[in-house]
Amino acid sequence: MLLFSVLLLLSLVTGTQLGPRTPLPEAGVAILGRARGAHRPQPPHPPSPVSECGDRSIFEGRTRYSRITGGMEAEVGEFPWQVSIQARSEPFCGGSILNKWWILTAAHCLYSEELFPEELSVVLGTNDLTSPSMEIKEVASIILHKDFKRANMDNDIALLLLASPIKLDDLKVPICLPTQPGPATWRECWVAGWGQTNAADKNSVKTDLMKAPMVIMDWEECSKMFPKLTKNMLCAGYKNESYDACKGDSGGPLVCTPEPGEKWYQVGIISWGKSCGEKNTPGIYTSLVNYNLWIEKVTQLEGRPFNAEKRRTSVKQKPMGSPVSGVPEPGSPRSWLLLCPLSHVLFRAILY
């Protein structure tokens, strides 16, 4: 009887270790009438270390797209470079992981003089800003482009140096930098952010990461709509649809890939726009391809050098394909990706 009990116990332990994991429940809190579980589902295994930029090892191969009032909720690991920049624990801008020390964002997010770096934090490694598993990093330095012009938003780029390095894994991945711009390069582009999903309703703020598809426009065509457009800017939208990034998740990345399954590259930083979600009216982004040398110079001067040449990979010119998968068909319910600003916040920053 004792031997049988020992064998039974061993079989139960072995089964627990080697058997399939219990499927995770569906996610979340009720958002606009859709009831979901307390937290977003997490990956069914611990994150594994990664070093490749633009990689989405957890997300690749998954095809589920949750729609929130016609918008789209990002899947776990779909935008592992995305971060939330917060002041006194209040989200106000977005950003992206450049490497373990550096966060890339927009200068206009940090354009003032009185909030010290130690009052800022960066949240990463999660889609849900209420998740207990999110990682929070302190900021050591705020660095703005010295030629940023508030009047026309030229050179709208900034860097945050973290107080301690990020332990990169497949939920915290640096984004790649491109070597060339142009709509002919990119097959699929997205923006993502935390914020409002209805321009008229400031209470429609989300704690879950939302995403919207984008197509990069021809610069000459866009400059006819926006006379103050400079060569340091690019335009992106989704023709005949109301997808847009708007007030608030400024500083977040516009990311593209040349082919499904390949690496992702940050081609733009959410900067400004004429309106939110109007058909055939694009948003304006900082054209990141113009700033590789600036990034290298600044990071070198700050003692945490970033060598873009070692991280960039040339992407092949590809013809534009059909609209990306998971995008609602015309006529289906949808809403804008809207993002909320934080008012009356002042920053102390270094200019380079």
From Swiss-Prot:
Residues modified by carbohydrate are 240
Q: Where is the lipid attached (GPI-anchor amidated serine)?
A: 325
Q: Where is this region: Disordered?
A: 308-330
> Which residues does UniProt mark as catalytic?
108, 156, 250
Q: Which GO terms describe its biological process?
A: binding of sperm to zona pellucida; flagellated sperm motility; proteolysis
Keywords, sorted A to Z: Cell membrane, Cytoplasm, Disulfide bond, Glycoprotein, GPI-anchor, Hydrolase, Lipoprotein, Membrane, Protease, Serine protease, Signal
The molecular function terms in GO held by this entry are: serine-type endopeptidase activity
Pro-peptide residues, renumbered to this chain, are 326-352
The molecule here is called: Serine protease 55
**What is the scientific name of the source organism?**
Homo sapiens
- As recorded in Swiss-Prot or TrEMBL, the protein's gene is named PRSS55
